[in-house]
Amino acid sequence: MRLRNKPWAKEKIAAYPQYVIPNPEEHKGRWNELFGNDHPIHIEIGTGKGKFITEMAKANPNINYIGIELYPSVLVSALDKLIENELPNLRLLNVNAKDLTNFFAEGEIERIYLNFSDPWPKKRHEKRRLTYRAFLELYEKVLVDEGEIHFKTDNQAFFEYSLVSFSQYGLVLTYVSLDLHNSDFEGNVMTEYEEKFSAKGNRIYRCEVKYPPKHQKAGL
């Protein structure tokens, strides 16, 4: 994806610390205090322009959402949506997902959304894929016992790779669709990217996986 540079994006993000949390490591293990409740927390890694997570937060007021996006020029669009909607159960982070354990304590997150992540198709870039084993290990550290990953992509090769990666790690597949928009799945919330590519007739792939119970993985 080619990004359009917005030199003013960082300045705008810095002007809204109540929405884009500037020092997320200070809230590690205490995100419930920031939200002012003990509702479950769901995060989206690669939140993009924010349509998905904004709509999810609107539809589910009893769930707290955190959108993570590395690029300020993209995140600023999600910030605009949050400013407009003033959602108390949504906050944003302008950080790198590889540092996830710096920001969240063990068992602090209930679910992770991966929507249309960069497939990094070249073999030498495999370690950058958000469904690579090292990332699955990272997610397990912050997720609750039997925590979930919900994954969507329009890239068949990346989807197949991810299914294998999930299986090899021991994740349990609880839902899969090879053509989401022609399935019986209800409640799908589309991203901007998803709207664009599904309108062209592109097939959307989706799956849900969960980690096995930790005592089971430990062989107890």
UniProtKB/Swiss-Prot annotation:
Database matches in PROSITE patterns: SAM_MT_TRMB
Record InterPro entries: SAM-dependent_MTases_sf, tRNA_(Gua-N-7)_MeTrfase_Trmb, tRNA_methyltr_TrmB_bact
GO molecular function: tRNA (guanine(46)-N7)-methyltransferase activity
Active site: D118
Annotated catalysed reactions: guanosine(46) in tRNA + S-adenosyl-L-methionine = N(7)-methylguanosine(46) in tRNA + S-adenosyl-L-homocysteine
Pathway: tRNA modification; N(7)-methylguanine-tRNA biosynthesis
Enzymatic class: transferase
Gene Ontology, cellular component aspect: tRNA methyltransferase complex
Keywords: Methyltransferase, S-adenosyl-L-methionine, Transferase, tRNA processing
Start and end residues of each stretch annotated as Interaction with RNA: 124-129
Chain positions recorded as S-adenosyl-L-methionine binding sites: E44, E69, N96, D118
Residues reported in the UniProt entry to bind substrate: K122, D154, T191, E192, Y193, E194
Enzyme Commission numbers on file: 2.1.1.33
Pfam families for the chain: Methyltransf_4
Protein family: Belongs to the class I-like SAM-binding methyltransferase superfamily. TrmB family.
Protein's job: Catalyzes the formation of N(7)-methylguanine at position 46 (m7G46) in tRNA.
HAMAP family listed in its UniProt record: tRNA_methyltr_TrmB
PANTHER family (alphabetical): 3-DEOXY-D-MANNO-OCTULOSONIC-ACID TRANSFERASE/TRNA GUANINE-N 7 - -METHYLTRANSFERASE, PENTACOTRIPEPTIDE-REPEAT REGION OF PRORP DOMAIN-CONTAINING PROTEIN
UniProt protein name: tRNA (guanine-N(7)-)-methyltransferase
